[in-house]
């Protein structure tokens, strides 16, 4: 007998092996029609897989989040079939589901065109309409290599050759077409539906290695229904308008160029925002009891070897040689912070020691992976390491979570998701230590009022971690903050403190960041507010614009008064119509314009116009300046509301 436990707590018994499809049919015709896949003891499988032993089983339908990845993976296969039907001789390589969609890499002599994408998408709809059964087959390794080699599919043959010896070689057949794949897949192509769209073309090296041939990548997106597809396409259109590279150019914030790939040229306006954000973070950390340090950018390989980074991270480090020594530009700050901790004897009374650095780091990212401010080679982290005892992990984590929530709120992000990554299979430290660390993180996030989802086995080898994900104004998620518990690095680098018992002990090291890197967070911030920064962050807060040249002297007086109150202001005295000036400064996302003419000069007033507003408010100059000076105060410096 095979006992099948279902999510509702019921148990169904079968005489022998049973498939997910049979279980669905047994439950009812509605589920039999809707079922797409099955999870067996937590692992997703095809509906056709026999279940031979007692198991916990859940049937997956289009309503389940897990179905989305399945849907997108199948879309990649249907696209590959369409390409090979339309363009014989094209080789297929790898085609996974990714966030919000899928892609497939093709080897083809002729480049694909946008018109080709339309043809491929139309053929995909035909293949869906055929409702071809998708059938899994297991082949002998030599048979599979010979088959794909004969077809001229050299990339597939290479993939099979590289599979572990104990792994099945599985292929999935859709009608006469088949592909190498681990699966799982939908029961038939018809289950994919037609809520998909091919998005763009790109180049990609085979296996991501620039020494290998360049392939053609086709990206697409797929959703359970047309409504969700349309919502996603609308979001993409809005995201294009908000693209930080586009907005950054329009607002003259920064630029990037080939001669310094992965590094940012900050213009005066962009650097103003950057420094304002950094000063805000510096004040928040100072108030939270952090000490700020600065460590060398070039560090001898010997330290990186001791820390383990040389072995695990060397390919991503920029290396320089000086006087027969190899020096690396630091990719992170943690080993250097331990060197500061080790200077002098530390007592348990010195803990927790919260050490922060706006550290300039460099990582040798592949040029193809670089993307505006979001993925760079040269960056500054809002990095800190908390040296504490095991008993202080809970309180320090809770304090960090509270600080993080407050910072995100000040910067306009109120939706925060937390991912909790627990112990991986390969790890350092005892189970007892891991139990304590994981329990401490759970307790701290609960105390901070943060809901979390589990990422099983995704912790670092040295300890569990939390990842903090922000949702922006158009519904996209961005992983920014992190907190990692580390028992290993203090041991490797010889950090210790004298405990209350007079003996030496290893501190626990909490690696933590709120923004992540300033560069990436600036990109996220620009896109979240579409360049309309909150008033306290805006690079230019006020423009004083004249209607006629008669008001030029008065405009200069207004400008001086604004600057005297610390406002970032400029005057526009050009001989242009006021509507032209309003339009130009609105496009530059300046939050406030003070319009002055002969009348305002005579009365000592200003006409205050806010960005996006259709009207203006006439105020006395002193009143306008007092209002704007109050609005320009950073959130952390504002007086707490009374009562």
Curated annotation (Swiss-Prot):
GO terms for cellular component: cytoplasm. It is found in: Cytoplasm. Keywords: Aminoacyl-tRNA synthetase, ATP-binding, Cytoplasm, Ligase, Metal-binding, Nucleotide-binding, Protein biosynthesis, RNA-binding, tRNA-binding, Zinc. One of its GO terms (biological process) is threonyl-tRNA aminoacylation. It catalyses: tRNA(Thr) + L-threonine + ATP = L-threonyl-tRNA(Thr) + AMP + diphosphate + H(+). Residues 243-534 are annotated as: Catalytic. Residues 1-61 form the TGS domain. Its EC number is 6.1.1.3. Its cofactor is Zn(2+). Belongs to the class-II aminoacyl-tRNA synthetase family. PANTHER family: THREONINE--TRNA LIGASE, CHLOROPLASTIC_MITOCHONDRIAL 2, THREONINE-TRNA LIGASE. Homodimer. This is Threonine--tRNA ligase. The lineage of its organism: Bacteria, Pseudomonadati, Pseudomonadota, Alphaproteobacteria, Rhodospirillales.
């Amino acid at each position: 007998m095979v006992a099948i436990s279902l999510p509702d707590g019921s148990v169904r018994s079968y005489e022998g092996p049973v498939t997910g499809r049979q279980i669905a049919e047994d439950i009812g015709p509605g589920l039999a029609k809707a079922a797409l896949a099955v999870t067996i003891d937590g692992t997703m499988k095809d509906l056709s897989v026999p279940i031979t032993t007692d198991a916990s089983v859940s049937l997956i339908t289009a309503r389940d989040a897990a179905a989305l990845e399945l849907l997108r993976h199948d879309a990649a296969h249907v696209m590959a079939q369409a390409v090979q039907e339309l363009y014989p001789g094209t080789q297929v390589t790898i085609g996974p589901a990714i966030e919000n969609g899928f892609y497939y890499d093709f080897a083809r002599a002729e480049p694909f065109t946008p018109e080709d994408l339309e043809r491929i998408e139309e053929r995909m709809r035909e293949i869906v309409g055929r409702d071809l059964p998708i059938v899994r087959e297991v082949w002998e390794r030599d048979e599979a290599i010979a088959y794909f080699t004969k077809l001229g599919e050299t990339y597939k043959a290479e993939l099979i050759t590289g599979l572990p010896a104990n792994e099945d070689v599985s292929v999935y057949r859709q009608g006469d077409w088949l592909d190498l794949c681990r699966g799982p897949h939908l029961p038939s192509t018809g289950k994919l539906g037609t809520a998909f769209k091919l998005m763009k073309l790109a180049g990609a090296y085979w296996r991501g290695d620039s020494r290998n041939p360049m392939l053609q990548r086709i990206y697409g997106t797929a959703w359970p229904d047309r409504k969700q597809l349309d919502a996603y396409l609308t979001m993409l259109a809005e995201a294009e308008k908000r693209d930080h590279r586009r907005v950054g150019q329009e607002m003259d914030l920064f630029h990037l160029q080939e001669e310094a790939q992965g590094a940012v040229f900050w213009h005066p306006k962009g650097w103003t925002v950057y420094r304002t954000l950094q000063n805000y973070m510096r004040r928040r950390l100072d108030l939270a009891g952090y000490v700020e340090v600065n460590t060398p950018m070039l560090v001898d390989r010997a330290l990186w070897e001791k820390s383990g980074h040389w072995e695990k991270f060397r390919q991503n480090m920029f290396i320089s040689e000086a006087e027969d020594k190899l020096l690396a530009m630091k990719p992170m700050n943690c080993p250097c912070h331990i060197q500061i901790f080790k200077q002098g004897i530390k007592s348990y009374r010195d803990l927790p020691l919260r050490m922060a650095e706006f550290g300039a780091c460099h990582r040798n990212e592949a040029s193809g992976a670089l993307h505006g401010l979001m993925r760079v080679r040269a960056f500054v982290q809002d990095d800190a390491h908390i040296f504490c005892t095991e008993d202080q992990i809970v309180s320090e984590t809770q304090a960090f979570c509270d600080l993080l929530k407050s910072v995100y709120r000040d910067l306009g992000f109120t939706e925060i998701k937390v991912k909790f990554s627990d112990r991986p299979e390969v790890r350092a430290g005892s189970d007892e230590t891991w139990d304590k660390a994981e329990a401490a993180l759970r307790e701290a996030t609960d105390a901070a009022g943060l809901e979390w989802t589990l990422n099983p086995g995704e912790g670092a080898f040295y300890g569990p971690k939390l990842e903090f994900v922000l949702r922006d104004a158009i519904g996209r998620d961005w992983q920014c903050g992190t907190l990692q518990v580390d028992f290993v690095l203090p041991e490797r680098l010889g950090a210790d403190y004298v405990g209350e018992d007079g003996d030496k002990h290893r501190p626990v090291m909490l690696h933590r960041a709120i923004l992540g890197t300033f560069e990436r967070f600036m990109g996220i911030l620009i896109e979240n507010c579409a360049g309309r920064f909150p008033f306290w962050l805006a690079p230019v807060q006020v423009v004083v614009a004249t209607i006629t040249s008669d008001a030029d002297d008065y405009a200069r007086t207004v400008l001086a008064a604004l600057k005297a109150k610390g406002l970032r202001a400029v005057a526009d005295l050009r001989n242009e119509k006021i509507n032209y000036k309003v339009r130009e400064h609105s496009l530059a996302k300046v939050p406030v314009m003070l319009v002055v003419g002969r009348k305002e000069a005579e009365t000592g007033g200003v006409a205050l116009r806010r960005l996006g507003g259709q009207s203006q408010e006439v105020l006395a100059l002193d009143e306008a300046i007092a209002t704007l000076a109050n609005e320009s105060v950073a959130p952390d410096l504002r007086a707490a509301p009374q009562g």
